[in-house]
């Protein structure tokens, strides 16, 4: 039997303390009724004896201690899931936000997900084509991987996210491909951009959007990514779809976590973030992957903005420990007008070797990737040397490497946000650029591939 309590004794920020409770569980959903009759939702954060601390999703403004009632519903926060969610836009709490009808759920699922037995996981191995050369060619995304994008304030990560959502697909697969997009604490303008972009290109038909705006209560940001991942798990493991989850901006999620931690008067960790930030982030990132015996998969691209462009900040630092690589956006490349401004040298996909090669992309992929990395790195060093000592100090080979580095940035990395390159086009473009270098410098490519794929001189 559900009990209703009128014993609210304290309200601090987004938190509320209810006394005299019995049989209340951690993470239990709470219905809060204000003295005005307005209803809000919350969840139990902590139970200590007969006291329960409740996190209020819609914020605590207007709550009167005497007139407020709390009803503990005996179940966690749930999302009603259905295949009809495709093509729809929801708010950060999973309510329809596009003037469409309510979803008739096939079932209701706890948004915290279930623990996955590590032995049930299957290893990521299939290539996902994003249409972005700097990712496909050099930092390949693999089905079931979690590959974050480290951006910074003012960089075009929103445009890159929209481009990937629009273009991504699994090659050589008959399975349906779906996008689940979670916007966490973004501005109204960004939300409008994403919705317009998805609708303009038709990507909305295979997508589910969860939009938590900057003007929404910060506490909702804790629920939004979990709503998105719950929807993704349903589509992947019960409907057999290949699901790509894009979450932006994880920094806003961590800020909301810090706000709750401060309200609970917890001992702060690095830079004021709670000591359990790593554990909490892992509850999001580890929901990516593949399961044995299941056709579907969940691939994650979380996007975060590094405060003060600092890679050692706790959010990117801890994210890097949990995920399988990172795509780093560069302010220097952005200032040069290179779009997307992906800095390929510090970027990394730890699973790229598992998703490339014969039968997946092309047999020469690994060799050309290694050679492009090496030549670009040498070319950048040659350009730095030229800036200090002058171009006359460079050898002929160094001059060619410096020119290669410029061409690589201008033609390979820079492609704009509307160009969708196939993996064949990306690999062929790499060969075209490598032709600028003397054959003696192409030490990382096998001779048979040089003979087979190197463009011939025009007759």
UniProtKB/Swiss-Prot annotation:
Keyword rRNA processing: no
GO biological process, one term: proton motive force-driven plasma membrane ATP synthesis
Family: Belongs to the ATPase alpha/beta chains family.
Pfam families, alphabetized: ATP-synt_ab (PF00006), ATP-synt_ab_N (PF02874), ATP-synt_VA_C (PF22919)
Record keywords: ATP synthesis, Hydrogen ion transport, Ion transport, Transport
Top-rank taxon: Bacteria
MF (Gene Ontology): ATP binding; proton-transporting ATP synthase activity, rotational mechanism
Protein name: V-type ATP synthase beta chain
Any one GO CC term of the record: proton-transporting ATP synthase complex
PANTHER family: V-TYPE PROTON ATPASE SUBUNIT B
Task of the protein: Produces ATP from ADP in the presence of a proton gradient across the membrane. The V-type beta chain is a regulatory subunit.
């Amino acid at each position: 039997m559900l009990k209703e309590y009128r014993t609210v004794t304290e309200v601090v920020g987004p938190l509320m303390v209810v006394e005299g409770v019995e049989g209340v569980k951690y993470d239990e959903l709470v219905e809060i009724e204000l003295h005005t009759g307005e209803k809000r939702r919350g969840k139990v954060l902590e139970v200590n004896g007969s006291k329960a601390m409740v996190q209020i999703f819609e914020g605590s403004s207007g709550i009167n201690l005497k007139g407020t009632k709390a009803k503990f519903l005996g179940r966690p926060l749930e999302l009603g899931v259905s295949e009809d969610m495709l093509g729809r836009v929801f708010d950060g709490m999973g309510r329809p936000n596009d003037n469409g009808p309510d979803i008739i759920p096939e079932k209701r699922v706890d948004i915290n997900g279930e623990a996955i037995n590590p032995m049930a996981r299957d290893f990521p191995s299939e290539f996902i084509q994003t249409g972005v050369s700097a990712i496909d060619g050099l930092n390949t995304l693999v089905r079931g991987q979690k590959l974050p994008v480290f951006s910074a304030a003012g960089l075009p990560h929103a445009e890159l996210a929209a481009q990937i959502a629009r273009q991504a697909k699994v090659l050589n697969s008959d399975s349906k491909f779906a996008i689940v997009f979670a916007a966490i604490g973004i501005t109204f303008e960004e939300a409008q951009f994403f919705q317009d972009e998805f609708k303009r290109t038709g990507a909305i038909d295979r997508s589910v959007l969860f939009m938590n705006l900057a003007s929404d209560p910060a506490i909702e940001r804790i629920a939004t990514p979990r709503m998105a991942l719950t929807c993704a798990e349903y589509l992947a493991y019960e409907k057999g779809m290949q699901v790509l989850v894009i979450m932006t901006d994880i920094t806003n999620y961590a800020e909301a976590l810090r706000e709750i931690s401060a309200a609970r008067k917890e001992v702060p960790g690095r830079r004021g973030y709670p000591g359990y930030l790593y554990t909490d982030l892992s509850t999001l990132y580890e929901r990516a992957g593949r399961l044995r015996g299941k056709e579907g998969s969940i691939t994650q691209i979380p996007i975060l903005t590094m405060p003060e462009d600092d890679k050692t900040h706790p959010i990117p630092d801890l994210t890097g420990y949990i995920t399988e690589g990172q795509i780093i956006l560069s302010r220097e490349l952005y200032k040069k007008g290179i779009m997307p401004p992906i800095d390929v040298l510090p970027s990394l996909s730890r699973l790229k070797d598992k998703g490339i090669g014969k039968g997946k992309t092309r047999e020469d992929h690994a060799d050309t990737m290694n050679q492009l990395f090496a030549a670009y790195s040498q070319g950048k060093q040659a350009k730095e040397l030229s800036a200090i000592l002058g171009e006359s100090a460079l050898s002929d080979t160094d001059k060619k490497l410096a020119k290669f580095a410029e061409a690589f940035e201008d033609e390979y990395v820079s492609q704009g946000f509307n160009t969708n390159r196939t993996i064949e086009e990306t690999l062929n473009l790499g060969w075209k650029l490598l032709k600028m270098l003397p054959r003696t410098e192409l030490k990382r490519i096998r001779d048979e591939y040089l003979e087979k794929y190197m463009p011939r001189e025009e007759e």
